[in-house]
């Protein structure tokens, strides 16, 4: 019998959660997606591990329910879109995204956290610059398992690394 974990995909808005789930993890290409209302749930198997993903919509009102989703999960993947990060830098949405991340960190306490830097095939800012400019390196001092992986659902880069990261959680 395979072990199983539950993982929440979370971000402030349209960072690529559903695309990561369907094109990246499920391998379904050219999926026509609309903004998620509520959540999507899908399960995949990787190296004997059953991984159930909850793709939570970024709409207003859903954020207030984050505690309910986080309570029943084993890990959180927080997505940051590297293709629009410069555009957001001067807008409140960008600031709100990182404020949301800080709130999530307070809620999840010692739950494993992976930051997925998405859409690197269209990136405008390097992962190094994202980490430094927005002080993500301060998250490394957390007591729980933490990581940053850059990925592209379209090229497949980083997808297996995310799955291996999740698989390693169960081994420890």
Task: Show the residue positions of the predicted features.
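TRAFAC-class small GTPase G-domain
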Residues: 1-172
């Amino acid at each position: 019998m395979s072990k199983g974990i539950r993982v929440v995909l979370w971000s402030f808005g349209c960072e690529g959660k559903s695309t990561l789930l369907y094109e990246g993890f499920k391998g379904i290409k050219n999926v026509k997606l609309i903004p998620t209302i509520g959540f999507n749930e899908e399960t995949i198997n990787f190296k004997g591990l059953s991984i159930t993903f909850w793709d939570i919509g970024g709409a207003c009102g859903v954020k207030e329910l984050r505690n309910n989703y986080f309570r029943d999960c084993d890990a959180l993947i927080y997505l940051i879109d590297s293709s629009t990060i410069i555009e957001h830098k001067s807008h409140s949405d960008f600031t709100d995204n990182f404020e949301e991340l800080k709130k999530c960190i307070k809620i999840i306490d010692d739950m494993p956290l992976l930051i997925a830097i998405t859409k690197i095939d269209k990136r405008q800012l390097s992962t190094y610059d994202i980490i430094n400019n927005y002080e993500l390196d301060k998250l490394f001092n957390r007591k729980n398992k933490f990581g940053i992986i850059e990925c592209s659902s379209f090229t497949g880069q980083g997808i297996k690394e995310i799955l291996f990261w999740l698989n390693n959680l169960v081994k420890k």
